[in-house]
């Protein structure tokens, strides 16, 4: 199938409709010489400042003077192009040009536009949150190596500009970009309309209706209506006024296109500051009368009507003669505008009844088109506002650490949303205080303000007069105290406004909108204020609603930033406090030197390899030397290259970080470590466990109860302590013990693991955590069933990691409960210490928490100790040591001691039962009575 051939005109039309494709092609295929020629030609074209020569055949009508006093025909349009040439004999249509610029619109279906999909944009949005370093060119490419350096550099810069990763804000903007485009239908040419007017009025009328029905842009629609009305009634000038302020009850007739000449070929430039607007008060003049009463006014001689205002004629020199004014209604009959035709052509003729009928037929269609365009404009405005609010949220989440930065972003967004001259944010000094006092003020002026206003603003800020006015602003104080927004349309007419301060500042305030800023707890933390809309109008209800919605997000952002600042200060205080505590929690240099120089007794002298070691045989210093001996005896100092001075310092600091509680103190930690050492050396576990595992369990034993407070995990949960809030209610204390051990290791001069390899260090810290957490009896109950089954079935395998983990956990528990394996006198003494500590916890539960403690913590039930010890041994201790004996028979002396101690507790329990029975018998009661007598 042969490809269709395109002529140059079709290609040019296609590129006009799709400029992004042309730009893409130029960026990829354009040459430097082409760009230089383009720059040279256009710089020459812009060099002459004189008027351009007029086009041949331009009608005299195109050179007539409009009421604004400017030439219509002989200049250039907004884009610098000359006006189009009218049809010869164009007087038939009142001198209307052939094809004005708005007639050259094209159907933009957008099918060939290159757009990133929503999915890809979302991915880019997520990727932009991370920091990437991208190379924007391929270092291996050498095809352009022969080009001049300037050209290579220029190409690299172009690539860099187009390939750098976009910011989060840009990607969000692309994601929120509206995919709804205004349909653009090219209207029929004016000369064709003139032809239809002469030969087929019905078709002529339908063409005019069709052209406005397809236009949803209010500006171009208004301009079309003016031109078409001029064309229909042969008027020299035409104006269109639209009703504004109906919702607020203050109607005004506003026209951005006033007295448009029928021969104007281009759509006039609209001013961003609405300098071309003409406002007519409701009910004033002929326009206001028609708008208020809805009547048609047809005046042959305007100067004979008392309602006519000739001020415009005096200013422009244009004389108004005949005038036809008619209301424009919406589909429900509401007046939404007024159309005015001036000076019937030929000059001096009045507008006829036929003109009135034609306008009456055409304006209802105009009303429908205007209503649709206004509805579309309102929806676009709401979309832009919603989009702006989402961008505000993005700004707030991107910056939550610096109050000044986030407030500046807020003020910049507020100015963009509300198009105001100034924006202020004032923050309260104390949100809890009933007295309103602002402590901080932030001010931003719009860049669209005049230079004089900006200079006045800078001078007032330098003199601090305006800052003082902000801090002592009575309107802001009122809003902060009542929590209600204030919207003042005319500041000088409002008694709440301080006019003197306004005059001193040199900035004239016309309108004020001030709303409170709330935090997440619905407390007022400040106020936000905007002044003077750029268009000169007061802030309306829509502005107020938008500003209040905007300030909700701003309040959350400011509150988060303030909270971050408070957390940052708290963190700094905590760092200082920890620094002070770590200084006092570490041992002194004299202590380290003392043990560093001391002679360490042998294992046999200390008897630390005995399973039945006396827990109370060594004093606090002797326990340090014994711990040093254990490290040396196990070969850990040599194997892991532990600095001896560091080891001494670490042991002394660990001892110092145990609290002076009755049982869970340094002596208990040492005794647990001693029993682990004895089991490793006596039972031969030293040959089964790796050196890293041995180091982990020895260090774990010494650190397993660091900073113990004498209360258990259940008490932490019941009391809602800081530890429970920090670590949760699962193994609360054990997590704290591990973290405390890590803190000591990370302190300067305490890292006994400093010479380990990276892998050894990582493995060791994981094993250390497992060892300390294993002392939680909850975890013991979870894992012991599996351990017992493995042992009873003979399926235990030292090569399986999970089996080794379970075994180490059981060893830690066996050592932690090891007092029950000691001789009776030692075991009983330890049991009494544990019970005393439990009783102190029970007393706190009763006094502080108003709870009745369980039997083991209840001092009033201390005589039940033997029974409780029997339950303890039978349910927890005995099964564990029985299983360990099955693993290694050398541990049988421990099991025998448990059985012996159980029999002792059984004897005490039986004696208590006999005593209880005897005290409750009748004979004992009689004996007691006789004793009393």
UniProtKB/Swiss-Prot annotation:
PROSITE patterns: PDEASE_I_1, PDEASE_I_2
Compartmental location: Cytoplasm, Cytosol
Residue span, GAF domain: 217-370, 402-558
Entry keyword annotation includes Cell membrane: no
Binding site for 3',5'-cyclic GMP: 424
Listed GO biological process terms: cAMP-mediated signaling; negative regulation of cGMP-mediated signaling; signal transduction
Active site, UniProt feature: 664
An annotated GO cellular component: cytosol
UniProt KW keywords: Allosteric enzyme, cAMP, cGMP, Cushing syndrome, Cytoplasm, Hydrolase, Metal-binding, Phosphoprotein, Repeat
Region (Disordered): 42-125
Family annotation (InterPro entries): GAF (IPR003018), GAF-like_dom_sf (IPR029016), HD/PDEase_dom (IPR003607), PDEase (IPR023088), PDEase_catalytic_dom (IPR002073), PDEase_catalytic_dom_sf (IPR036971), PDEase_CS (IPR023174)
Tissue specificity annotation: Isoform 1 is present in prostate, pituitary, heart and liver. It is however not present in testis nor in penis, suggesting that weak inhibition by Tadalafil (Cialis) is not relevant (at protein level). Isoform 2 may be expressed in testis. Isoform 4 is expressed in adrenal cortex.
Cofactor: binding comment: Binds 2 divalent metal cations per subunit. Site 1 may preferentially bind zinc ions, while site 2 has a preference for magnesium and/or manganese ions.
Positions of the PDEase domain: 588-912
SUPFAM superfamilies from the UniProt entry: GAF domain-like, HD-domain/PDEase-like
Modified sites of kind Phosphoserine: 162-163, 239
Regulation: Inhibited by 3-isobutyl-1-methylxanthine (IBMX), zaprinast and dipyridamole. cGMP acts as an allosteric activator. Weakly inhibited by Sildenafil (Viagra) and Tadalafil (Cialis); however, the fact that the protein is probably absent from testis, suggests that it is not biologically relevant and is not related with erectile dysfunction.
Keyword Transport listed: no
Cofactor(s) demanded: a divalent metal cation
One of the record's GO molecular function terms: cyclic-nucleotide phosphodiesterase activity
Positions that bind a divalent metal cation 1: 668, 704-705, 816
Function comment: Plays a role in signal transduction by regulating the intracellular concentration of cyclic nucleotides cAMP and cGMP. Catalyzes the hydrolysis of both cAMP and cGMP to 5'-AMP and 5'-GMP, respectively.
PANTHER family named in the record: CYCLIC NUCLEOTIDE PHOSPHODIESTERASE
Protein name per the record: Dual 3',5'-cyclic-AMP and -GMP phosphodiesterase 11A
Gene: PDE11A
């Amino acid at each position: 199938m042969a490809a269709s051939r395109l002529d140059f005109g079709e290609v040019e039309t296609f590129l006009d409709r799709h400029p992004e494709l042309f730009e893409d092609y130029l960026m990829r295929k354009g040459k430097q010489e082409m760009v230089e020629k383009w720059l040279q030609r256009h710089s020459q074209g812009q060099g002459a400042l004189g008027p351009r020569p007029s086009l041949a055949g331009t009608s005299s009508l195109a050179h007539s003077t409009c009421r604004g006093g400017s030439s219509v025909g002989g200049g250039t349009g907004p884009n610098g192009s000359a006006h189009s040439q009218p049809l010869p004999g164009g007087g038939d249509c009142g001198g209307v040009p052939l094809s004005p610029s708005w007639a050259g619109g094209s159907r933009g279906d957008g099918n060939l536009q290159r757009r990133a999909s929503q999915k890809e944009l979302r991915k880019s949005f997520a990727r932009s949150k991370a920091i990437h370093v991208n190379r924007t060119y391929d270092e291996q490419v050498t095809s352009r190596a022969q080009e001049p350096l300037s050209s290579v550099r220029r190409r690299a810069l172009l690539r860099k500009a187009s390939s750098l990763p976009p910011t989060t804000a840009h990607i969000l903007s692309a994601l929120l970009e509206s995919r709804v485009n205004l349909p653009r239908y090219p209207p029929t040419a004016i000369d064709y309309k003139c032809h239809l007017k002469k030969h087929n009025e019905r078709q002529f009328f339908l063409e005019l209706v069709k052209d406005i029905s397809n236009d949803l842009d209010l500006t171009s629609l208004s301009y079309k209506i003016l031109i078409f009305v001029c064309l229909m009634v042969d008027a020299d000038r035409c104006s269109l006024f639209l009703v504004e302020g109906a919702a607020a009850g203050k109607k005004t007739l506003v026209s951005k296109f006033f007295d448009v000449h029928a021969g104007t070929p281009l759509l006039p430039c609209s001013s961003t500051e609405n300098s071309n607007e003409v406002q007519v008060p409701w009910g004033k003049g002929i326009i206001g009368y028609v708008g208020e009463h809805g009547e048609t006014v047809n005046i042959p001689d305007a100067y004979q009507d008392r309602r006519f205002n000739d001020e415009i004629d005096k200013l422009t020199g244009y004389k108004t003669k005949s005038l036809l004014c008619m209301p424009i209604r919406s589909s429900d009959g509401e007046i939404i505008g007024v159309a005015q035709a001036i000076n019937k052509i030929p000059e001096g003729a009045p507008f006829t009844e036929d003109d009135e009928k034609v306008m009456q037929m055409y304006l209802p269609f105009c009303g429908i088109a205007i209503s649709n365009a206004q509805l579309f404009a309102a929806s676009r405005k709401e979309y832009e506002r919603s989009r702006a609010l989402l961008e505000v949220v993005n700004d707030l989440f991107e910056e939550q650490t610096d109050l000044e930065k986030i407030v500046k972003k807020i003020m910049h967004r507020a100015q963009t949303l509300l198009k105001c001259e100034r924006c202020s944010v004032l923050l309260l000094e104390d949100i809890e205080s009933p007295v309103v006092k602002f402590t901080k003020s932030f001010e931003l002026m719009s860049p669209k303000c005049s230079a004089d206003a900006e200079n006045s603003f800078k001078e007032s800020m330098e003199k601090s007069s305006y800052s003082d006015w902000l801090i002592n602003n009575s309107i802001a104080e009122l809003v902060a105290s009542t929590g209600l927004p204030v919207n003042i349309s005319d500041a000088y007419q409002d008694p709440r406004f301080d006019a003197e301060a306004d005059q001193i500042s040199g900035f004239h305030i016309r309108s004020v909108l001030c709303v409170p800023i709330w935090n997440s707890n619905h407390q007022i933390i400040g106020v936000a204020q905007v002044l003077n809309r750029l268009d000169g109008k007061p802030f309306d209800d829509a502005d107020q609603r938008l500003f209040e919605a905007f300030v909700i997000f701003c309040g959350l952002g400011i509150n988060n930033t303030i909270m971050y600042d408070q957390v940052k200060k708290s963190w700094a205080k905590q760092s200082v406090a920890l620094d002070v505590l770590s200084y006092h929690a570490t041992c002194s240099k004299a202590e380290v030197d003392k043990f560093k120089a001391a002679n360490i007794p042998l294992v046999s002298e200390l008897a630390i390899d005995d399973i039945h070691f006396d827990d109370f045989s060594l004093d606090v210093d002797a326990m340090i030397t014994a711990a040093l001996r254990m490290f040396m005896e196990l070969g850990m100092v040599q194997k892991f290259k532990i600095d001896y001075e560091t080891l001494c310092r670490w042991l002394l600091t660990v001892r110092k970080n145990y609290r002076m509680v009755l049982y869970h103190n340094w002596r208990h930690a040492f005794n647990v470590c001693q029993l682990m050492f004895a089991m490793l050396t006596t039972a031969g576990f030293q040959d089964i466990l790796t050196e890293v595992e041995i180091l982990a369990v020895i260090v774990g034993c010494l650190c397993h109860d660091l900073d113990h407070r004498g209360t258990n995990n259940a008490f932490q949960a019941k009391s809602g302590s800081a530890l429970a809030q920090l670590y949760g209610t699962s193994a609360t204390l054990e997590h704290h013990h591990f973290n405390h051990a890590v803190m000591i290791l990370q302190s300067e001069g305490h890292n006994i693991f400093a010479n380990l390899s990276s892998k050894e260090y990582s493995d060791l810290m994981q094993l250390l955590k497992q060892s300390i957490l294993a002392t939680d009896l909850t975890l013991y109950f979870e894992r012991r069933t599996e351990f017992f089954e493995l042992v009873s079935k003979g399926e235990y395998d030292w090569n399986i990691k999970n089996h080794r983990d379970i075994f180490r956990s059981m060893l830690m528990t066996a050592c932690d409960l090891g007092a029950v394996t000691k001789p009776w006198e030692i075991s009983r003494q330890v049991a009494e210490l544990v019970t005393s500590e439990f009783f102190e916890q029970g007393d706190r539960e009763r006094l502080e928490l108003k709870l009745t403690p369980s039997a083991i913590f209840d001092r009033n039930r201390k005589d039940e100790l033997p029974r409780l010890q029997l339950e303890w041994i039978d349910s927890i201790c005995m099964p564990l040591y029985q299983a360990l004996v099955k693993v290694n028979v050398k541990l049988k002396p421990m099991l025998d001691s448990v059985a012996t101690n159980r029999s002792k507790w059984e004897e005490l329990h039986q004696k208590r039962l006999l005593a209880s029975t005897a005290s409750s018998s009748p004979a004992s009661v009689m004996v007691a009575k006789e004793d009393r007598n």
